[in-house]
Design a protein with these regions (language model features):
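C-terminal segment of N-terminal export signals and the immediately downstream linker at the start
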Residues: 3-4, 24-74
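Histidine- and aromatic-rich segments of cupredoxin/plastocyanin-like copper-binding domains
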Residues: 184-192, 196-197, 264, 274-436
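Beta-strand cores of secreted/periplasmic/IMS beta-sandwich domains, seen most often
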Residues: 70-83, 106-185, 194-230, 236-264, ...
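Active-site pocket scaffolds in enzymes
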Residues: 139-159, 164-192, 196, 341-364, ...
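Short, solvent-exposed loop/turn elements at domain surfaces
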Residues: 80, 87-93, 99, 129-133, ...
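Predominantly extracellular/luminal regions of secreted and cell-surface proteins
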Residues: 76, 83-85, 256-277, 432-477
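N-terminal edge beta-strand
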Residues: 97-107, 299-307, 490-510
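N-terminal secretory signal peptides and thylakoid transit peptides that target proteins
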Residues: 1-18
Length: 651
């Protein structure tokens, strides 16, 4: 199940570049490759797909966000980016949609930088009015409300149980930019509380001391990120380096970003016609208040609903980002007969850079969860004169994403995927081992309904090592027991924080290796993002039985056991990443070294609804010499190894 908000998942959850001068950035326009027009028919007449919700699929050409590069100073590069209102057509058969944008573009312009070239960006808030969307919720009894446009009856009244979300219509432009995947100090990371109002600017510096990779920037305002990103505030940020240059991967018009997301739209209640107004509509259970993350019936690529792309019969490179609030995409490349051709696709990179070698698409398709990036090579030379589709086979709505129209004539293309990609890559546990003297962090995610609370939660856990501190009986709220498969012994953990504003409990000394243990106690999956560092997936285990976790109480009645090997780690999952999906019942371990930056950072579920509903927590990275003098909850604590946690409790 790759769409976390289909009926089954909902019920489960409910129950339990080079520096240069850029002139006139404000006038930048998105380009379309190869001079396409909305009515281009590359391969002659064919039967078009039936319109869906009145929109013709594959009618409009894919737009390519403009690339902007910085202007140079002696010691750094600089860039000015404005947040502005803009009207854009998401489909040529639609009226214009009001959006919040970076530089008037949806998605925002692609920022391209060179490794080790420091960039200072001035983000200026020029937005006006309130957030340009309508937010409603509908009870699950209303047939598929999240996957159909509109929300009102023909007389403009609300159907039974459908409600406008209080306060959303009054949300002002209060924004903060986070560069997702960046290794930068806390003051430049985009702390969620540090919003800027209209007329204000956010000044950030990005050192870019990291390998060539696909990052992205987006709004991260506290408690309202689901609305601001949905309104349009997201864009790509590419880091280039000499290692990548030497591979001579497809470039220029043959390197294309694919920023995939879903949206819903309002309708005229009388005529049923789509108005172009963004509609943030989701399902909920009236009895409990438990809600499903927002999804929509329209799939957009680079801000265009169901676009097409004319391609040469040669290799292409696609920088893919899942920028959806909550929808998962399981990608397959299919022909007109529906035959899968994933053997024409190679995965060459993930979130934080290139893989050591090209990897095949896994059997069953390539799952990309919210905020994940994949760097793909596709060989179109095999499909001269054909039309292919990129589809989402994990969708609970129409699977089509976009269409590729391959030209009929052959093209000279000397490129072949290199057998070796990143010579600097090392696999943790082989060439480099996480040192024995490392820190361990334990975090668990819960189902909705714990102690009557409606939303899934994220708990920071601290191990109870003194027998006298163990509960006298189980279950007890906030206490988790599990059987460690490495030793066979039972370990007991107590929750020490669950809300963002609870006491900070995770303190990491700069330069330390940390293994994060992420444990999923049931319900919908969670793509977990940790700021500031890059990580590798060390292991994936799966508990055989989750009934030991008593949802009503919020603790285990007996130790969770049977944590056997989970699904094998695919080759592309061995790359450096910053976002890891956590499926139901899984216990994954990811390792990273917190070096090169200090400050206060965040980690969270990147389903934006979950993030805003509480699944986000802070952590601190500081110099070890300073840490010994830091007074915090429980008193000062000199680093003693073994755990990144220091004494603390729930606030």
């Amino acid at each position: 199940m790759d769409d976390p908000v289909d009926r089954r998942a909902f019920m489960v959850s409910a129950l339990l570049g080079t520096a240069g001068v850029v002139a006139g950035v404000q006038s930048l326009g998105a380009r379309t490759p190869r001079g396409e027009t909305p009515v281009a028919t590359v391969n002659g007449p064919q039967t078009p797909p039936a319109p869906l919700f009145g929109l013709t699929k594959f009618l409009d050409p894919l737009r390519i966000p403009p690339t902007i590069r910085s202007y140079s100073r002696q010691y750094r590069d600089e860039l000015d980016v404005s947040l502005t209102n803009a009207r854009r057509r998401l489909h040529s058969q639609l009226p214009e949609t009001m959006l919040w944008t970076y530089e008037g573009q949806f998605p925002g312009p692609t920022i391209e930088v060179r490794r080790n070239r420091r960039l200072r960006v001035t983000w200026t808030n020029e937005l006006q009015g309130t957030v340009p969307l309508v937010a409603v919720r509908a009870p699950y009894a209303v047939p598929t409300p999240a996957n159909t446009p509109g929300y009102r009856n023909p007389d403009r009244s609300l159907p039974a149980g459908v409600e406008l979300i209080d306060g959303v219509a009054e949300l002002p432009p209060w924004n903060v930019v986070h560069l997702h995947g960046a290794l930068t100090n806390g003051g430049n990371d985009g702390w969620a509380h540090n919003g800027m109002s209209p007329g204000d600017s956010q000044l950030t510096e990005y050192p870019n001391r990291q390998a060539a990779s696909t990052l992205w920037y987006h709004d991260h305002a506290m408690a309202v990120t689901r609305f601001t990103v949905h309104a349009g505030l997201a864009g790509l940020y590419l880091i280039r380096d000499e290692e990548e240059d030497g591979l001579r991967l497809p470039s220029g018009d043959h390197e294309i970003p694919l920023i995939i997301a879903d949206r819903n739209l309002d309708t005229d209640p009388v005529t049923g016609a789509l108005t172009g107004q963004l509609l943030f509509k989701f399902q909920y259970q009236p009895a409990t208040g438990t809600s499903a993350p927002v999804t929509g019936p329209f799939t957009l690529v680079n801000g265009v609903i169901w676009p097409h792309l004319d391609v040469d019969a040669r290799w292409y490179r696609f920088r893919v980002l899942n920028a959806a609030n909550g929808r998962f995409f399981r990608l397959d490349l299919v022909d007109e007969a529906g035959t899968v051709h994933n053997d024409a696709v190679r995965i060459v990179g993930t979130d934080a850079g290139l893989l050591p070698a090209p990897a095949a698409v896994p059997a069953g398709g390539l799952t990309v969860t919210p905020a994940e990036r994949v760097d793909l090579l596709v060989d179109f030379s095999r499909f001269k004169g054909q039309r292919l589709r990129l589809v989402n086979t994990g969708a609970s709505v129409d699977p089509d994403i976009m269409q590729f129209r391959v030209e009929s004539r052959s093209r000279h293309d000397s490129f072949t995927p290199p057998a070796r990609l990143s010579a600097s890559y090392v696999r943790l546990g082989s060439a480099v081992t996480v040192p024995e003297d490392h820190d361990e962090v334990f975090v668990a995610t819960t189902l909705p309904g714990v102690a009557g609370r409606p939303h899934p939660e994220m708990w920071e856990l601290q191990e109870i090592t003194e027998p006298a501190e163990l509960p006298t009986r189980f279950p007890e709220e906030g206490v988790i027991q599990l059987t460690d498969p490495a030793t066979g012994g039972v370990r007991t953990f107590r929750r020490v924080a669950r809300l963002f504003d609870d006491t900070t409990t995770i303190f990491i000394d700069r330069g330390r290796w940390v293994v994060w243990n992420l444990i999923q106690l049931g319900g919908a999956p969670h793509p977990m993002h940790i700021h500031m560092a890059r990580f590798q997936l060390l292991s994936r285990r799966k508990f055989a039985d989750l009934t030991a976790f008593d949802v009503a109480v919020g603790g285990t009645s007996r130790p969770l056991s049977g944590a056997g090997d989970g699904p094998s780690i695919e080759k592309h999952e061995e790359g450096w990443k910053d976002t890891f999906n956590l499926w139901a019942g899984e216990w994954i371990r990811v390792a990273g070294r917190f070096e090169g930056a200090t400050g206060e950072f965040m980690y969270h579920c990147h389903i934006l609804d979950h993030e805003d509903e509480g699944m986000m927590r802070p952590f601190v990275v500081h110099p070890p010499e300073v840490a010994r003098f830091h007074m915090r909850s429980g008193g000062p604590a000199h680093h003693s190894g073994g755990s990144a946690h220091h004494p603390g409790g729930e606030g």
